[in-house]
UniProtKB/Swiss-Prot annotation:
GO terms for molecular function: 1-(5-phosphoribosyl)-5-[(5-phosphoribosylamino)methylideneamino]imidazole-4-carboxamide isomerase activity. SUPFAM superfamilies: Ribulose-phoshate binding barrel (SSF51366). Disulfide bonds: none annotated. It is found in: Cytoplasm. One of its GO terms (biological process) is L-histidine biosynthetic process. This is 1-(5-phosphoribosyl)-5-[(5-phosphoribosylamino)methylideneamino] imidazole-4-carboxamide isomerase. Keywords: Amino-acid biosynthesis, Cytoplasm, Histidine biosynthesis, Isomerase. It comes from Staphylococcus epidermidis (strain ATCC 35984 / DSM 28319 / BCRC 17069 / CCUG 31568 / BM 3577 / RP62A). Pathway: Amino-acid biosynthesis; L-histidine biosynthesis; L-histidine from 5-phospho-alpha-D-ribose 1-diphosphate: step 4/9.
Length: 234
């Protein structure tokens, strides 16, 4: 099966989910962050845990560093972190605290020279998060239009030693309506970088379909909080 990366989105050290990235749609999850990590860690199909500092993404600087660092001891699974990462120092701080991978978004999209430098400083440790409505890339916590096309932009960074590209269709995020198979599949064919699908994943059938499209991994948010999603998985 495709690699499975369950997501934990943080606001004030609490696990929440948003719909279409809108902060006023915040929904608190029943399981605590700690319980979620312990639960996900029991599954072999879970290859890493994806954590996002939502306030950090909005504030353009990391807000949950100490709390996220405290989570490292709860699992032996690799952890990747995103949200507000815009400096070499922040990346170093996370890596030195035991976080395995960092996700960069807005800064990397707006400043390819910086992204190039960082990927060579931390080869295969950085993932680029590209969030879009269709092919139109959004930045700064999905609030602003980057005025960039998804495919045009990925062509410019394809040669970099990134771990991969995380593509989120914002219109699907948090809705449990299925991912954007068309665009995600086209992107996986278009680039030699590993493509990670995010947004809208509902059930295991979605995972199998993404796998058939040569997608490397799937980030699962709201569905991962539903017991039925995990039925039959080990």
């Amino acid at each position: 099966m495709i690699d499975l990366w369950p997501a934990i989105d943080l606001i004030n050290s609490t696990s929440v989910r948003l719909t279409e990235g809108k902060y006023d749609s915040k929904e608190k999850m029943e399981k605590s962050v700690e319980d979620s990590i312990r639960f996900y860690s029991q599954f072999k199909c879970v290859k890493r845990i994806h954590i996002v500092d939502l306030i950090g993404a909005k504030a353009k600087e990391v807000k949950e560093f100490d709390y996220i660092r405290s989570l490292r001891k709860l699992t032996t699974k690799p952890i990747e972190v995103g949200g507000g990462i815009r400096s070499k120092q922040t990346i170093e701080n996370y890596i030195h605290s035991g976080i395995d991978y960092c996700i960069v978004g807005t800064k990397g999209i707006q400043d390819i020279e910086w992204l190039t430098h960082m990927t060579h400083q931390f080869p295969n440790k950085l993932y680029l998060s590209v969030d879009a409505f269709g092919e139109k890339i959004k930045i700064n916590g999905w609030k602003e239009d980057a005025k960039l096309n998804l495919f045009d932009y990925v062509a410019k960074i394809e040669h970099l030693p990134l771990g991969g590209v995380i593509y989120t269709d914002i219109s699907k995020d948090g809705k449990l309506s299925g991912p954007n198979f068309d665009l995600t599949g086209r992107l996986a064919l278009y680039t030699s970088l590993p493509v990670i699908a995010s947004g809208g994943i509902r059930h295991q059938e979605d995972l199998f379909r993404l796998e058939s499209l040569n997608v490397h991994a799937a980030i699962v948010g709201k569905a991962a909080h539903l017991d039925e999603f995990w039925e039959g998985l080990s």
